[in-house]
């Protein structure tokens, strides 16, 4: 196996290597769940390594390479268990969009997975406009020609299952007790049901959490709840080195894994999925091709449970100071409108 570096402990094993150098050597039917965000073809270049999926010549070639990885994940996944893929629609030209999630679904079904569900993750369109300089999201376009405007892109999580029969059920015998998100659990529910030992069908705290997790749109994912990532960024990368939010990972691991399950992430990045798996009492296997990302992941995992950061949304990568693009709404007003919008969606 062409491994540049590695760190193997009792709770996790991470490899600085091309995932296709590592995955074929893992045991079939050994992974309880996989959670990851694949490279987005034609969107970013993460490194100059020819093995990097971001260095493909075309979108179609990127999907062909990705198919090999999906096939391996299918082989590794235990029967009845799941894989969760974070993705989004991709740009096609300067205005139109490509259905990347649809192609991911097709590729997984080709490998043998069954498509289970899709959850949308809400993102503030104004912040997206600032971060990406997406002119089609500018309010001034509504005034000038709304035929040129578009809807802000959501993130998605696609969930797939291998077969049906699960040899080890994922059980929450005392219901759901912790919540990953910006909403505050009503105090009355916490007081009455935190240590509830009766009929769990009547556990209203667990019901409240489940109702939010089962929602087709996750409205309160904290976009700034991340792992440290700045040290992994190299020249000209700051705008797209942004790890997957820990709230998303925590929800998926809660729903689709048991303690001590082995959780796989073939695109480790700075270690977010592996970190959360270890923090939640799971085991983790991860691969990362880029040395700077791997070093940051190694550092983050060495402090699992005590390294999370909270980044303000206007401080995320690519969110420079206000400039000529921000000709519609000043930051203070946009933040105020955002708070009002979020509070209006917190009713359950």
Identify what each model region corresponds to.
Residues 1-296, 334-348:
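Core catalytic lobe of class I
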Residues 2-9, 298-313:
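Short, conserved SAM-binding/catalytic segment
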Residues 16-21, 314-322:
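Conserved SAM/SAH-binding loop
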Residues 136-137, 280-281, 304-306, 312-313, ...:
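Short alpha-helix boundary/capping motifs
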Residues 170-175, 308-318:
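Short, flexible loop/turn segments with low-complexity composition
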Residues 308, 321, 345-347:
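Polar low-complexity intrinsically disordered regions enriched in Ser/Thr and small residues
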Residues 316-334:
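Conserved P-loop NTPase motor core of helicases/translocases
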């Amino acid at each position: 196996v062409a491994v540049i570096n590695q760190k193997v402990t009792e709770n996790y094993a991470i490899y600085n290597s091309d995932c296709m150098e590592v995955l074929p050597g893992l045991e079939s039917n050994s992974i309880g769940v996989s959670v990851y965000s694949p490279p987005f073809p034609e969107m970013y270049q993460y490194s100059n390594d020819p093995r990097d999926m971001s260095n493909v010549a075309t979108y179609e070639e990127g999907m062909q390479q990705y198919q090999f990885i999906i096939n391996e994940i299918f082989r590794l996944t235990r029967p009845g268990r799941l894989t969760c893929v974070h993705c989004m629609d991709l740009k096609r030209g300067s205005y139109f969009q490509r259905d990347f999630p649809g192609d991911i679904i097709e590729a997984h079904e080709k490998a043998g997975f069954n498509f289970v569900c899709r959850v949308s993750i809400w993102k503030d369109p104004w912040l997206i406009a600032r971060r990406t300089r997406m002119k089609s999201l500018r309010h001034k376009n509504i005034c000038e020609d709304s035929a040129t405007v578009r809807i802000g892109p959501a993130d998605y999580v696609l969930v797939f299952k291998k077969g049906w029969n699960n040899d080890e059920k994922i059980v929450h015998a005392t219901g759901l007790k912790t919540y990953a998100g910006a909403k505050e659990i009503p105090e009355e529910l916490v007081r009455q049901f935190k240590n509830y030992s009766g009929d769990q069908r009547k556990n209203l705290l667990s019901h409240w959490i489940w109702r939010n997790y089962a929602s087709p749109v996750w409205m309160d994912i904290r976009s700034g709840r991340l792992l440290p990532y700045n040290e992994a960024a190299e020249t000209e990368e700051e705008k797209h080195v942004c790890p997957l939010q820990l709230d998303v990972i925590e929800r998926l691991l809660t729903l689709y894994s048991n303690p001590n399950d082995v959780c796989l992430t073939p695109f480790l990045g700075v270690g977010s999925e592996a970190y959360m798996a270890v923090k939640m009492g799971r085991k983790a296997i991860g691969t990362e091709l880029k040395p700077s990302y791997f070093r940051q992941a190694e550092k983050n995992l060495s402090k699992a449970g005590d390294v999370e950061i909270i980044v303000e949304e206007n401080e995320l990568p690519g969110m420079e100071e206000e400039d000529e693009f921000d000709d519609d709404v000043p930051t203070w007003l946009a933040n105020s409108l955002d708070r009002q919008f979020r509070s209006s969606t917190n009713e359950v």
